[in-house]
From Swiss-Prot:
Subunit comment: (Microbial infection) Interacts with rotavirus A non-structural protein 2; this interaction probably plays a role in the sequestration of DDX6 in viral factories. Interacts with rotavirus A non-structural protein 5; this interaction probably plays a role in its sequestration in viral factories.
Coiled-coil regions listed: none
One of the GO biological process terms: spermatid differentiation
Protein name (database record): Probable ATP-dependent RNA helicase DDX6
Species: Homo sapiens
GO cellular component, one term: cytoplasm
Modified residues (Phosphothreonine): 36
Length: 483
């Protein structure tokens, strides 16, 4: 029976007959991306939000045992090395090391335990400038380490002796807020006192008000909720020294721009503003001219699409789409896939069809209750299902590195939407596949998007070379490696 898991997370047809269902997917971590998460961590975030990093007592005792001169790196619990092939999107660096930035040892410990070995290009450009206190306007591709680029200097500049809010990260979606806050918590876990709070719409406002009675150093929020808390006098932002706008193009679109203007007006005049996005339309330029002071501009966008993502299209009629999808499922070696539809109704209908075909499937869209969205997001991220059907809710910043295939079941109308959709695969320089089901009515949009993005979307071949999107890799425990 294919009932939508909206009462229990949205899961469709987990059956042993499904050819893709070969046990849980192993999530992987990458610099600036998400890393692995457990449901226990999700519950901790959901129930406490203001977090004294659950592990900090352990972390403090750990840091106190390290004496000057000790090789502190030997105490680290490093994840297995990710030996997958990476593209120049993340490997084309200047050769810097995280130690070159004179970061606190406790912060370095968190960085290395995330599996972040060396800074990516956006991190190399961003970290030293952000540490100097200068405003930044940064363009970088999706999935190249933007989160680490701003979280590392943000955490380094915290004064843990003070008990006020010192930094804010504003993101456009609730799922992205939870993801960024979890990364922040993990990176800062050895800092012994860094308190991170995630606050988003769709959660209990009273709980957030109570949490703000305690010490909070970093707030990661969606725009409407944090403005509400500021106006109520609960979130006191008169000591905020840094504000980050992640996915700035979305935050400064018509939906949010007035809210963002109102938030900025509540902050101290000498605050530092960091803007990060893959695209910067006119609205971002206008905001920059009004609020940023001599910003340092970073542009790592020689081309818009990720080098590791191969793009194909298949011409179909509307009635042929499900059959074509079934063929793709049977022929592709999918680790995890994200399938995009253009409406919530079509998401649910397609998820039901996929279930009937015998494949495991979650679905998620903006009309679902927040707690159900949270469960679907974290269950999919933890590899409990191979396929996720969704709307464009899932296009912004979401980092699930096990995803190697993105399918546009419904082709988008805007180049910006297309860019963010296909950026869900090929994360952090890895390989991925984007397949577009194109109807007669989509043909002009296809041509237009190719021209706007300066990319080539090829006709799908009868056989797709697995080396384009399947990462055959082996992870070995770090302690087994020889110097």
């Amino acid at each position: 029976m294919s009932t939508a898991r909206t009462e229990n997370p949205v899961i469709m047809g987990l059956s042993s007959q499904n050819g893709q269902l070969r046990g849980p997917v192993k999530p992987t971590g990458g610099p600036g991306g998400g890393g692995t998460q457990t449901q226990q961590q999700m519950n901790q975030l959901k129930n406490t939000n203001t977090i004294n990093n659950g592990t900090q007592q352990q972390a403090q005792s750990m840091t106190t045992t390290i004496k000057p001169g000790d090789d502190w790196k030997k105490t680290l619990k490093l994840p297995p090395k990710d030996l997958r092939i990476k593209t120049s999107d993340v490997t084309s660096t200047k050769g810097n090391e995280f130690e070159d930035y004179c970061l606190k040892r406790e912060l370095l410990m968190g960085i290395f335990e995330m599996g972040w070995e060396k800074p990516s290009p956006i991190q190399e450009e961003s970290i030293p400038i952000a540490l100097s206190g200068r405003d930044i306007l940064a363009r970088a591709k999706n999935g190249t380490g933007k989160s680490g680029a701003y979280l590392i200097p943000l955490l380094e500049r915290l004064d843990l002796k003070k008990d006020n809010i010192q930094a804010m990260v504003i993101v456009p979606t609730r799922e992205l807020a939870l993801q960024v806050s979890q990364i922040c918590i993990q990176v800062s876990k050895h800092m012994g006192g860094a308190k991170v709070m995630a606050t988003t719409g769709g959660t209990n406002l009273r709980d957030d008000i109570m949490r703000l009675d305690d010490t909070v150093h970093v707030v990661i929020a969606t725009p409407g909720r944090i403005l509400d808390l500021i106006k109520k006098g609960v979130a006191k932002v008169d000591h905020v020294q840094m504000i980050v706008l992640d996915e700035a193009d979305k935050l400064l679109s018509q939906d949010f721009v007035q809210i963002m203007e109102d938030i900025i007006l509540t902050l101290p005049k000498n605050r530092q503003i960091l803007l990060y996005s893959a695209t910067f339309p006119l609205s971002v330029q206008k905001f920059m001219n009004s609020h940023l002071q001599k910003p340092y501009e970073i542009n790592l966008m020689e081309e818009l699409t990720l080098k590791g993502v191969t793009q194909y299209y298949a011409y179909v009629t509307e009635r042929q789409k499900v059959h074509c999808l079934n063929t793709l499922f049977s022929r592709l070696q999918i680790n995890q896939s994200i399938i995009f539809c253009n409406s919530s109704q079509r998401v649910e209908l397609l998820a039901k069809k996929i279930s009937q075909l015998g494949y495991s499937c979650f679905y998620i869209h903006a009309k679902m209750r927040q707690e159900h969205r949270n469960r679907v997001f974290h269950d999919f991220r933890n590899g409990l299902c191979r396929n996720l059907v969704c709307t464009d809710l899932f296009t912004r910043g979401i980092d699930i590195q096990a995803v190697n295939v993105v399918i546009n079941f419904d082709f988008p109308k805007l180049a910006e939407t297309y860019l963010h959709r296909i950026g869900r695969s090929g994360r952090f320089g890895h390989l991925g596949l984007a397949i577009n089901l194109i109807t007669y009515d989509d043909r002009f949009n296809l041509k237009s998007i190719e021209e706007q993005l300066g990319t080539e979307i090829k006709p799908i071949p009868s056989n797709i070379d697995k080396s384009l999107y399947v990462a055959e890799y082996h992870s070995e425990p770090v302690e087994d490696e020889k110097p």
